[in-house]
Amino acid sequence: VIEPLEPDAELLDPSMRTTYATDGWLPIRRVAGEIEVATAAPLTPRRRARIQRALGGAPIRERLTPQAVIVATLTDRLRAEYADQAADGLYRMNPGLSARYVLSRSQKVIVVVLLVVVAVFAVLWPLATLMAFIGLASVVFLASTLFKFFVALRGSRYDLVARVGKDEIDALSDDDLPMYTVLVPVFREARIVGRLVENLGRLDYPTSKLEVIILVEEEDAETRDAIAESDPPSHFIVVTVPKGTPQTKPRACNVGLEVARGEFLVIYDAEDAPEPDQLKKTVIAFARADPSVVVMQAALNYFNARENVLTRMFSLEYSYWFDYMLTGLDVRNLPIPLGGTSNHFRTQALRELGGWDPYNVTEDADLGIRASALGYRVGVVDSTTMEEATSRLGIFIGQRSRWIKGYMQTALVHARQPFALIRQIGLVRFGAFTLLIAGTPLTFLGVIPFTALTIVSFFLPWADLSFAFPPVILWICLLNFLVGNALMVYLNMMGPYKRGAFWLVGWATLNPVYWLLHSLASYKALWQLITKPHYWQKTEHGMSNFTLEAPMAAPAGAPVDVRGDAGR
């Protein structure tokens, strides 16, 4: 257990807390006319002079202290400042970009007016109102599905992934590598943190240039104890996230961002197993890329893809998303919503963006849109991080409801000033944002009604809905049902081809059922958006019977990044 220092409160300047952490020093006390300074590295003349200037020119004496102790002291003594900045830093910087409030004042007025108008029309012309609603929903459903189809089809023609060869990695000198920070927010993960320490301990990067910051909530003593029992290497730092609200992953990450020393920074989840050379590949990819590229996204896939039907569908979805959809968005220079993990950032650019929005439960998607609005771009690096796919239905619904609720939040936040966003990113990119971020939850909300209406109308001979719906409405529903599902089945069939996992292709025919599950989750998401918008529905990890260390047989030709065992 790391014991924090007890610095003199008069010497500790809260406004310099980021400087203290990133530069690795801290004023402790006055001793015989000098200021004793805790420092993580011996003071060079240049660094000594810089610290003296920061302390008003007073002479200093050094006290070598591990970086972990310096960070622990800061987060302990300045916990109120860290908690406040992590929760409300973005809101103070730009209230309009924060999901702290679900609706702005003008949005509330618009919603009330729309509800009143719809209620009046529903009373006076109920059937006409219902038909208009179905017609509008049909347009949104089909437009969003067609958008995804054509973007993915476009992406299938290109390979824009930053490919890095082994010879390039071998040519890297440790002395030339930049400092890299790994952030790992964990909460109630005592059962898997030992595996986490092993997985991140395999990263091929000089430990003198690497800091792994594990962010643990203040009340989560069980996880903190489990980390200590796993005996992590010295470059692992456990940072206590001060109590506060909202208790979300992005809030914890904001604390980590304040103490991060790396030129580059990556987020991993507790169950992640990145390829060992991922950091080096990303350094090379950033060196090649235009300065406007501030994020590199590594691919994600699952080590337990073959566990059951649900995990197979997960793997199909991720294969299509990372191999085709992201590439298609990049080709068209459209906004790219980030994945929740394996995002590699230029740290300074991330700070300029205001970090993560702690009130948005899909902070990754929101950050991708904010980056795009400032002219930044997202790149893709050819490295895969293996994760645990949710294998239990209840956990899946909870996880997807959080993701869909976050898309709803992101759409509402960036709809507050639509004309400003259009000026920033252009009309075409705004349209793409609308179809992807707003269209996705709206599409899922429409799946159950469209499916039910279609089945009742065309597959139940005894049901006659002609008294309520003209044939044209019913045929539109059938068209949506057939075309929408056919396109998504086709896209999911495309996913495994690039990876050679042909054994997954047939499972894509179950996508209509998979979408029904998403539709259930979307209604839960909508309810939570109204009742508890900032609630973070945690996904339980460590539930799978599959592990990276205990491979199981996979069909011939299944590549390591999509097979059930990930066989590494």
Regions inferred by a protein language model and the residue ranges of each:
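Acidic donor-binding segment of Leloir-type glycosyltransferases
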Residues: 201-244
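Membrane-embedded multi-pass helical conduit in multi-pass membrane proteins
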Residues: 121-165, 172, 435-531
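Cell-envelope/extracellular polymer assembly enzymes that use nucleotide-activated donors
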Residues: 178-181, 211, 351, 366
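Catalytic donor-sugar/metal-binding loop of nucleotide-sugar-dependent glycosyltransferases
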Residues: 368-386
